[in-house]
Structure formats: C-alpha cells, structure tokens
C-alpha cells in the first residue's frame, strides 16, 4: 500500500519491502534471544523467505512467472534436501556439513561484493530510501503482531516471528 501511495515501481521495490534479511541477521539474533529453540523456528522462517526470494522475488523482477526459474535455482533444491533430512531424521555426513559451512562463508563475501557493485549502478533518493527502509522495519512488525494475535501465537515462536519480521531488507533483493 505504501509503494502504491508513493507511486513506486512495484516490481522493483516490493521485494525489499516484503522479503527481510531473516538469514544473515535474523537467525543469529533469534539464536541469541531464544537459544536453540529459537534457532529452529528462525531457520524455518528463513527457509520460507529464501524460497520466496528465488520464486516470488524473481517473478516480480522479471514480471513473468516461469517454473524454469524455480527448477534452475540451487537454493530451492538445497531447501528440499534439508527438509527431507529433517523429516526422515537423517544424520548429515561430516564432509557435507563442513563443505556447507565453508561455502556459506565464501558466499557471504561474494554477496557483499556483488551488492557493492550493484549499488554503484543505482540512482536513488536519500529521502525515499529512508522512508522505504523505515516502512520495512515498522510495517513488518505491525503486520506480524496482527498475525500473532490472529493465530493466537505465544512464547518463543511468537517472539522469533516478531524478530524475523523486524529485520531490514535482505541483500538478495538488490542483486
């Protein structure tokens, strides 16, 4: 609604408003706040948001939905495999776990480098950027509180959801 009122390009500016940084920021904060209980819920929320990044986010950017994009996206397969491991309570091989951690650290560096390059090409207004950033971190929790009340959530699950909804826009939105 905010983007519509401001007459902004929904395909370019909706993903940063609806897809927060639940992975790199949200998971560690939830782990700190709620321990391993919060980590599980935060990871599940982050997985759903990542799926939205690589489906809804791509759909909005291209303005055309194609299942090819979904089937060509490695994170989608990684999440499916992770869900299968969790569902069947399988032990992750040590070499796979170690490799995943190493790739994670390398990926964070590459994503931040890509973000820096992408931001040099953006033309933006400081006023609009501040307004949209505040909209993201204010509207997310407001909507989350409505959801928490509607579904009668409580305890650490409600807290984790609230923390995750308050995260700023994710780097993936700008790449």
Please describe what each predicted stretch is.
Residues 1-175:
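Alpha-helical transmembrane segments of multi-pass small-molecule/ion transporters
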């Amino acid at each position: 609604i905010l983007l519509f009122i401001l007459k902004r390009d929904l395909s370019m500016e909706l993903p940063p408003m609806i897809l927060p940084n639940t992975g790199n920021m949200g998971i560690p904060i939830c782990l700190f706040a709620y321990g391993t209980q919060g980590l599980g819920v935060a990871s599940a929320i982050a997985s759903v948001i990542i799926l939205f990044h690589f489906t809804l986010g791509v759909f909005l950017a291209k303005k055309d939905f194609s299942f090819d994009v979904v089937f060509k996206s490695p994170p989608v397969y990684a999440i499916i495999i992770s869900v299968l491991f969790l569902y069947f309570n399988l032990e992750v091989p040590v070499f796979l776990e170690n490799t995943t951690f190493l790739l994670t650290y390398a990926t964070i560096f590459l994503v931040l480098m890509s973000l820096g390059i992408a931001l040099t090409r953006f033309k933006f207004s400081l006023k609009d950027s501040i307004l949209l950033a505040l909209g993201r971190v204010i509207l997310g929790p407001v909507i989350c509180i409505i959801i928490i009340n509607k579904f009668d959530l409580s305890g650490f699950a409600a807290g984790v959801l609230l923390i995750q909804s308050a995260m700023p826009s994710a780097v993936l939105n700008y790449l």
